[in-house]
């Protein structure tokens, strides 16, 4: 086979502050994951890699070991390094088109049990769907915090009722990338993304009203709907294209059947779906025709693997009736709880609810995020994070294909943080969850994402944690736990 040669002048990925050996490995990793290098291709020798990148033999060797640990290359005695064979991709889960009648959310304790273990130290992968700590810009945020504290000590005690004007300006400036034009005064800052969703629901619906939402859906949305005394109507969703517009059309033909629709169109949690542009247009048009508002969460929209950021539903909103919600909690600063919403024509009601029910938030943290956005740090961070998540998603998908038993299906997200896995029908994901918890393997059972029983043989994993030999070992063990149920 012809030996693979790399362009010496090609940019090394990932960029510093990663160790040099990871930067050297990054070029090979990119060539492998994009398909330029295929299973069985011979790779440059250690000596050649040293010459190509001007590094020491120990650095080149560490680069190959790092790639070996990720399952991307293999060493053959007396022959050198080769691209490792890739496992056959698993098929995608299929759309379950069944619809349940609208009903009050009745928690069965499983979600509460999941939340109790969500902060369990040492779990790998972790239970929480967010970027791993080593991928977060903690050092930069600490530096900005110290700098802003010196310049503006008053921020530690001063509170702006509508939130930081600087942050609202930065959010408005960046909104154009998602296809929507916003004025800073149209933006309301919140204590995280879920508070934004909570305020939005209270602004457009009341106890007893029916809320249409994707099925499966993020379990905290079900918890919020339950806390407000509302009913949920689960609309079937496809793991690739998201909410079924046809099913929503059918469900809303009776006037007043649905008071609002809640949707995560870009890289939905738990399935990772990305709604096509035409479906986004159809959804907004259908909501306008039937007279119900749409509450949109775009918390994962910046985590795209492709070149283009997908537009938000609100970019198609001529009636100003889409309430756009987002936050910086998944990819920048989980502990800051900085979120925001653009409520459109519901702004006054959302402001009233916010002012009556919660604090404006910590202005210092809002100012830190604002400066992070303004000085280019956010863009640099997101480029690195997206590259890392794309690699981690592929590594996890390969491991699942390698270690899980036959009969499994796997979503193929084009961004976000979540993988949705369909197990053989006879597997009970609750039992998988219970055993995995005992062994510190962070897995979410499908039943937490629905009020029905249709996802009892599904699980959600996330790929926010950097790929390590320990993570691969835990996934291999998870595959064994699943296989044990098959006998």
Protein language model annotation of sequence segments:
Residues 318-387:
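Conserved core segment of the aminotransferase class I/II
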Residues 150-290, 295, 301-317, 389, ...:
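Conserved core of the PLP fold type I
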Residues 55, 72, 230, 292, ...:
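Short glycine/serine/threonine/alanine-rich loop segments
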Residues 1-147, 327, 351, 355-362, ...:
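N-terminal basic, amphipathic alpha-helical segments
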Residues 74-75, 182, 443:
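Short beta-strand "wing" residues that participate in macromolecule-binding interfaces
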Residues 449-453:
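AMP-binding (ANL) adenylation modules
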Residues 382-408:
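Conserved PLP-dependent catalytic core of the aminotransferase class-I/II
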């Amino acid at each position: 086979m012809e030996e693979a040669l790399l362009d010496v002048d090609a940019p090394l990925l990932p960029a510093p502050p990663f160790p040099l050996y990871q930067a050297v490995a990054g070029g090979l990793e990119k060539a492998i994951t994009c398909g330029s290098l295929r299973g069985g291709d011979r790779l440059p020798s250690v000596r050649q890699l040293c010459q190509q990148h001007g590094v020491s033999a120990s650095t080149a060797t560490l680069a190959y070991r790092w790639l070996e640990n990720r399952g991307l290359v293999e060493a053959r005695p007396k022959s050198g390094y080769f691209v490792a064979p890739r496992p056959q991709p698993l098929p995608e889960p299929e759309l379950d088109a069944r619809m349940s009648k609208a009903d009050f959310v009745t928690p069965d304790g499983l979600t509460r049990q999941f939340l109790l273990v969500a902060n369990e130290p040492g779990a790998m992968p972790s239970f929480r769907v967010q970027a791993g700590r080593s991928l977060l810009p903690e050092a930069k945020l600490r530096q900005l915090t110290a700098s802003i504290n010196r310049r503006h000590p008053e921020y530690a005690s001063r509170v702006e009722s509508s939130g930081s004007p600087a942050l609202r300006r930065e959010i408005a400036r960046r909104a154009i990338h998602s296809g929507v034009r916003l004025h800073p005064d149209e933006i309301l800052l919140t204590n995280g993304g879920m508070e934004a969703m909570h305020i939005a629901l209270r602004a457009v619906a009341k106890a007893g009203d029916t809320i249409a939402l994707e099925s499966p859906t993020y379990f905290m949305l079900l918890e919020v709907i339950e806390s407000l005394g509302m009913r949920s109507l689960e609309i079937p969703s496809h793991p690739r294209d998201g909410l079924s517009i046809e099913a929503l059309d059918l469900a809303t033909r009776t006037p007043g059947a649905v008071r609002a629709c809640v949707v995560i169109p870009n890289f939905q949690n738990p399935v990772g779906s990305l709604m096509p542009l035409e479906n986004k247009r159809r959804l907004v048009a259908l909501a306008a025709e039937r007279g119900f508002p749409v509450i949109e969460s775009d918390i994962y929209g910046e985590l795209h693997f492709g070149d283009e950021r997908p537009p938000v539903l609100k970019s198609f909103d001529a009636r100003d009736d889409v309430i756009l919600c987002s936050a910086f909690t998944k990819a920048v600063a989980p502990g800051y709880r900085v979120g925001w919403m653009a409520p459109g024509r519901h702004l006054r009601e959302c402001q009233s609810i916010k002012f009556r029910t919660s604090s404006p938030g910590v202005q210092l943290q809002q100012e830190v995020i604002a400066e992070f956005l303004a000085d280019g740090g956010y863009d640099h961070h997101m480029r690195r994070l997206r590259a890392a998540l794309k690699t981690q998603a592929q590594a996890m998908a390969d491991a699942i294909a390698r270690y899980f038993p036959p009969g499994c299906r796997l979503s193929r997200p084009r961004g976000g943080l979540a993988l949705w896995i369909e197990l053989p029908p006879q597997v009970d994901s609750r039992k998988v969850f219970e055993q995995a918890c005992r062994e510190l393997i962070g897995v979410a059972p499908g039943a937490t994402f629905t009020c029905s029983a249709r996802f009892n043989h599904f699980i959600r994993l996330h790929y926010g944690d950097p790929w390590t030999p320990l993570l691969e070992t835990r996934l291999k063990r998870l595959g064994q736990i699943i296989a044990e149920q098959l006998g």
